[in-house]
């Protein structure tokens, strides 16, 4: 090859590299909202106690942090497992359960789903369960 052709080819390669480096960055996907899901005990969401207080915390996080918050009310003890499974299907990032009555169902569900995060209000486990926080 002639010296001129080599010089031209080198300039084209360098120019191509510079143009590629200056290209716009691919648009990043917006971060998905964190979904926090609460299951009440049989007292309902407006019990003026633990259920209402926990839900108020989630509502505050929705407003201040931009998370997504949902709840399911348990009308009877038999609803606990059904509600836990519903939120597992919805792929909640954190499932908050409220009250000692839901403690056994929360533990069983957490142990069967170790990659899901749980929190329980008004209950503690001894020994602690690895994926249940806020005990």
Language model region names:
Residues 1-34:
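Short, low-complexity disordered leader/linker segments with a strong preference
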Residues 24-135:
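A residue-level marker of the well-folded mature domains of exported/periplasmic proteins
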């Amino acid at each position: 090859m002639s010296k001129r052709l080599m010089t031209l080819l080198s300039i084209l390669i360098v120019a191509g590299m510079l143009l590629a480096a200056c290209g716009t960055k691919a648009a990043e996907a917006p971060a998905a909202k964190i979904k926090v899901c609460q299951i009440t005990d049989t007292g309902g969401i407006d019990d003026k106690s633990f259920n209402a207080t926990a839900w108020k915390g989630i509502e505050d996080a929705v407003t201040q942090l931009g998370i997504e918050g949902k709840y399911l009310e348990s009308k009877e003890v038999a609803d606990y497992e059904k509600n836990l499974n519903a939120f597992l299907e919805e792929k909640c990032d954190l499932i908050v359960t409220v009250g000692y009555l839901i403690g056994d169902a929360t533990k069983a569900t957490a142990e069967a789903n170790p990659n899901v995060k749980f929190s329980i209000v008004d209950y503690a486990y001894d020994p602690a369960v690895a994926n249940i926080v806020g005990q």
